[in-house]
């Protein structure tokens, strides 16, 4: 990842990545390390195994500073379709890899983290979302609806 990584994104995207990087870099040393990732998952109410964190960090060629962070996202996002990108974002919140996320948990995350959606915006999303009787949102179906405009037949 060289300085041309910045040409992959527009200024607003770079700013959003910078905000995300700053949130994850808990100790504010300019690098994302194992402890930063553990703290981030803990703040989201999720545990994560050390092995999984090591796997994530192994994707970079060295210490993860902002430029490397941006490059990792550039690599992940280049050649992916919007549906896959949205799906990957939901998968981060699905620690058990069941394909569903509790709607109350999702609402809390959406209204308290990063872009902070309003209750009205979250309700609009839930209005078009497949949610089961236990209150779990089927995010794979929601991704399809978001990118194609209707549920799969």
UniProtKB/Swiss-Prot annotation:
The keyword Metal-binding applies. Residues 12-47, 81-116, 117-152 form the EF-hand domain. Coiled coil: none annotated. It comes from the Eukaryota. Ca(2+) binds at residues 25, 27, 29, 36. SMART domains: EFh (SM00054). GO terms for molecular function: calcium ion binding. Keywords: Calcium, Metal-binding, Motor protein, Muscle protein, Myosin, Repeat. InterPro entries: EF-hand-dom_pair, EF_Hand_1_Ca_BS, EF_hand_dom, Myosin_RLC. GO terms for cellular component: myosin complex. PANTHER family: MYOSIN REGULATORY LIGHT CHAIN 2 (PTHR23049). This chain binds calcium. In molluscan muscle, calcium regulation is associated with myosin rather than with actin. Muscle myosin contains two types of light chains: the catalytic light chain, essential for ATPase activity, and the regulatory light chain, a calcium-binding protein responsible for Ca(2+) dependent binding and Ca(2+) dependent Mg-ATPase activity. This is Myosin regulatory light chain, smooth muscle. It comes from Halocynthia roretzi (Sea squirt).
């Amino acid at each position: 990842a060289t300085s041309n990584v910045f040409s992959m994104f527009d200024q607003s995207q770079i700013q959003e990545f910078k905000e995300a990087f700053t949130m994850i870099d808990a100790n504010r040393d300019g690098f994302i390390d194992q402890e930063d990732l553990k703290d981030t998952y803990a703040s989201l109410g999720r545990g994560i195994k050390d092995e999984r964190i090591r796997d994530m960090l192994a994707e970079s060629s060295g210490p993860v500073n902002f430029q490397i962070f941006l490059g990792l996202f550039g690599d992940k996002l280049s050649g992916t379709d919007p549906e896959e990108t949205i799906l990957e974002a939901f998968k981060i919140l699905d620690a058990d890899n069941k394909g569903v996320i509790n709607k109350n948990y999702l609402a809390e995350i959406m209204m308290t983290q990063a872009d902070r959606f309003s209750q009205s915006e979250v309700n609009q999303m839930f209005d078009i979302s497949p949610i089961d009787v236990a209150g779990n949102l089927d995010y794979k179906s929601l991704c399809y609806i978001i990118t194609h405009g209707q549920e799969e037949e």
